[in-house]
């Protein structure tokens, strides 16, 4: 069979189905000594060491016990339950606790089917996979749905003046969202019954679309250290901007509450908590309160009915000149709502708020006449118009940045005003779970920004 396989073409191999026959597997242990040691794991034994994403600092190894992971199988079902008919398409790395638990262990425990992609889930690979697999469940990070919304959905409502006018009126906007929602379901294979979103803050504009479109999504909140889920909401219970209430068996409260805002650090008590950080006793000690609650590092507030609202990461928060708490994630959400912005990072440079932006080239070309030609000519260093086009492009991009600066500052409060927009020139450096490595850009800001596109 090996010789025959070697003769097959790549096209034929890709169409082959792999069948594993379990009949006769008992023969493997037939001659094993009865005295062989049985290694039965105990609940408090370490089952996995999974590293944090490393968005704000160096990744830490999180030690999760068998008890912590298995207890997730008791706290998740009241929120959402898999069944044997479910088909899950895995698009996140299994080294991420979110995918490991919700995308593998939990569906396996319910007898669901799981398909794995053999390449990164970029659009050219993901779209065909969705049509082939036709999944009923996907566990995703916000970035993927935000990209779908910005590239596939929002442009359809900006085609002409009539559509823009209709979209600006709430009743017709909801109707347009309903129509677009049906197309989105078809895009995802037509069988989707649960699209889980977690791992980062979800853009409110994209979430508003999903809710009004009737798309079957859910929001989850958790961390690597909590294996991961702490709170969540699905279906009609979803509230835009909230991660939902604490899951069954999980307790959440606020620590170090600011009396003026009612916000504080969210701390958690859960049976799914880590045993500690691998070979890092100091970090482990700092991760818990004196009475044993886990410090999430997230700032937010909890409504009277228990619904959790996250404002941002404690490490990301910027203190303004008069002591104001500034959440860069809120400013970035406004930046990202502009059609020409693909993604952004807000930080401080010499004590002033600045926005580092990755522009959407296609959106820029569609919005500003002549940019497409300038982009092409400015890349051709051997062309006769290289220097002239590059100069014209820089002037045009300065105009774009000024417009974006005005756009943002008209939508944020006075102490969240940004002073400068910097073009990063390319995508931001990210973790395997598509989170921007913020600390990389915060570190660069201390010495004055050098965009990624200019780095050697």
For each feature predicted by the language model, list its residue ranges:
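Adenylate-forming
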Residues: 273, 307-336, 363-378, 383, ...
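Conserved ATP-binding/catalytic segment of the ANL
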Residues: 246, 253, 260-320, 337
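Conserved AMP-binding A3 loop
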Residues: 47-73
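Structural core segment of the AMP-binding/adenylate-forming
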Residues: 1-27, 36, 351
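Conserved pre-ATP/AMP-binding loop-to-beta segment of ANL
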Residues: 17-51, 58, 81-87
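Conserved C-terminal "lid"/linker of ANL adenylate-forming enzymes
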Residues: 343, 351, 403-456
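Conserved AMP-binding/adenylation subdomain of ANL enzymes
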Residues: 70-87, 94-183, 191
């Amino acid at each position: 069979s090996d010789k025959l396989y070697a003769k097959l073409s790549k096209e034929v191999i890709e169409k082959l189905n792999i069948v594993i026959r379990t009949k006769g597997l008992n023969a493997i242990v037939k001659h094993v000594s009865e005295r062989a040691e049985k290694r039965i794991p105990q609940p408090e034994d370490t089952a996995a060491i999974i590293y944090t994403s490393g968005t704000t600092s160096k990744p830490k190894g999180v030690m999760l016990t068998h008890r912590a992971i298995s207890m997730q199988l008791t706290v998740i079902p009241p929120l959402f339950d898999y069944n044997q008919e479910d088909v899950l398409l895995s698009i996140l790395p299994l080294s991420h606790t979110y995918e490991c638990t919700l995308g593998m262990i939990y569906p396996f425990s319910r007898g669901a089917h799981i398909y794995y992609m053999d390449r990164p889930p970029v659009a050219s690979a993901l779209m065909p996979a969705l049509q082939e697999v036709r999944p009923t469940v996907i566990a995703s990070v916000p970035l993927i749905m935000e990209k779908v919304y910005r590239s596939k959905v929002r442009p359809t409502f900006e085609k002409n003046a009539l559509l823009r006018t209709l979209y600006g009126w709430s009743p017709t906007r909801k109707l347009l969202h309903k129509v677009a929602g049906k197309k989105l379901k078809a895009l995802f294979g037509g069988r989707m019954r649960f699209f889980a979103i977690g791992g980062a803050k979800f853009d409110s504009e994209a979430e508003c679309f999903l809710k009004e479109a009737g798309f079957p999504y859910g929001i989850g909140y958790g961390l690597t250290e909590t294996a991961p889920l702490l709170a969540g909401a699905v279906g009609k219970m979803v509230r835009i901007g909230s991660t939902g209430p604490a899951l069954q068996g999980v307790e959440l409260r606020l620590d170090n509450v600011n009396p003026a805002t009612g916000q504080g650090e969210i701390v958690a008590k859960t049976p799914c908590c880590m045993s500690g950080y691998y070979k890092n006793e100091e970090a482990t000690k700092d991760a818990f309160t004196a009475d044993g609650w886990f410090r999430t590092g997230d700032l937010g507030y909890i409504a009277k009915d228990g619904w959790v609202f996250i404002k941002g990461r404690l490490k990301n928060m910027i203190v303004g000149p008069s002591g104001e708490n500034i959440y860069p994630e809120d400013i970035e959400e406004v930046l990202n709502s502009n059609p020409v912005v693909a993604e952004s990072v807000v930080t401080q440079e010499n004590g002033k708020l600045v926005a580092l932006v990755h522009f959407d080239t296609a959106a820029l070309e569609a919005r500003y006449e002549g940019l497409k030609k300038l982009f092409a000519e400015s890349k051709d260093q051997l062309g006769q118009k290289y220097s002239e086009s590059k100069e014209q492009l820089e002037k045009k991009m300065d105009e774009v940045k000024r417009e974006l600066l005005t756009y943002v500052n008209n939508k944020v409060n006075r102490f969240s005003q940004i002073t400068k927009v910097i073009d990063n020139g390319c995508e931001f450096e990210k973790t395997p779970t598509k989170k921007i490595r913020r600390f990389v850009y915060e570190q660069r800001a201390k010495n004055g920004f050098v965009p990624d596109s200019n780095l050697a």
